[in-house]
């Protein structure tokens, strides 16, 4: 059990069962230390924040700070990753992965402001989040102690946590009936557990929270025009908005048409495979818009580099290395490529799909005169022969050498 001397500790608090139990547990096991509850508002469900300060105080916290990070989350964390085209293992838009460094950074800043000597999170010992939180803590405030209750206590079940709170007369609205584990922010919502623990069991409707089932979506497609400047979405249907505002507008459209659902088995950083259902409606539309502009403005080599860049960025962000030099280096490359990614894209939303059907950009490299197959073709076909001979020279040499043997 605890051996460190801690007088004041800042807890990343969600108001859920786990972190509600952590508050009294910290006071009992760390010398009746002062526990400060920190709540990051990153666009999670509004009902999760109602009365959260009172809930923290009833659990024994000395105070509770709720910090609005919604715009910061989208502008400074989501948009930079979106520029790179990062998709973890080809499909996951990194909703939880991008949020954790921001939460941990704001938590560290509050701890330093209040003169705390320790930080605490409620991530389990099997998941990725413990790594993401603590890697950020180490990068920004290595002098602060870190407490991870799930790696210390013997409360291993939901029932044990409920009994723990009941024994201390701490009220909670949690029950034993919870089946799924969910994480939500402005960008996405994830669902794990329950029926999803068997990869052979299809996800049922309870696994989806935000989005309409594609087969039940409207029978008529809906078109949305997305404005992009330097790799960032700046307007929806001609209306300029903040990053968070753009996401809210696209989320509303995407959920109605069942856009942004994925059901995947992913490789966790800690070596365990896990299955989850992710819903990222607005983000999926944004990704389609950016890729549409990229098709016009990036040459072949730049596009291939962006593909490699996105893959590497996905691993760095997923692993929680947001403040590492590698992530910053990758970001510089992504920003350079995105400098030309400006334009407008019309996205068709229909039965779970978001398809770019019209696109334009002042930086477009697409030239109709060169692309046409008509008689007014400005491309001299005879030039292709010399290019092909040089392009295939290594193959020719290899074949000639083989013939001599």
From Swiss-Prot:
Gene assigned in the entry: argG
SUPFAM superfamilies in the cross-refs: Adenine nucleotide alpha hydrolases-like (SSF52402), Argininosuccinate synthetase, C-terminal domain (SSF69864)
Subunit structure: Homotetramer.
GO MF entry, a single one: argininosuccinate synthase activity
PANTHER family according to UniProt: ARGININOSUCCINATE SYNTHASE
Keywords (A to Z) from UniProt: Amino-acid biosynthesis, Arginine biosynthesis, ATP-binding, Cytoplasm, Ligase, Nucleotide-binding
Entry's EC annotation: 6.3.4.5
Protein name (Swiss-Prot/TrEMBL): Argininosuccinate synthase
UniProt family annotation: Belongs to the argininosuccinate synthase family. Type 1 subfamily.
One of the GO biological process terms: argininosuccinate metabolic process
Metabolic or biological pathway: Amino-acid biosynthesis; L-arginine biosynthesis; L-arginine from L-ornithine and carbamoyl phosphate: step 2/3
Catalysed reactions listed for this entry: L-citrulline + L-aspartate + ATP = 2-(N(omega)-L-arginino)succinate + AMP + diphosphate + H(+)
Subcellular location: Cytoplasm
Stored Pfam families: Arginosuc_syn_C, Arginosuc_synth
Keyword Repeat annotated: no
Residues the record lists as binding L-citrulline: 92, 97, 128, 132, 181, 190, 266, 278
Binding site for L-aspartate: 124, 128-129
Cellular component GO terms, alphabetical: cytoplasm
Residues binding ATP: 12-20, 40, 122
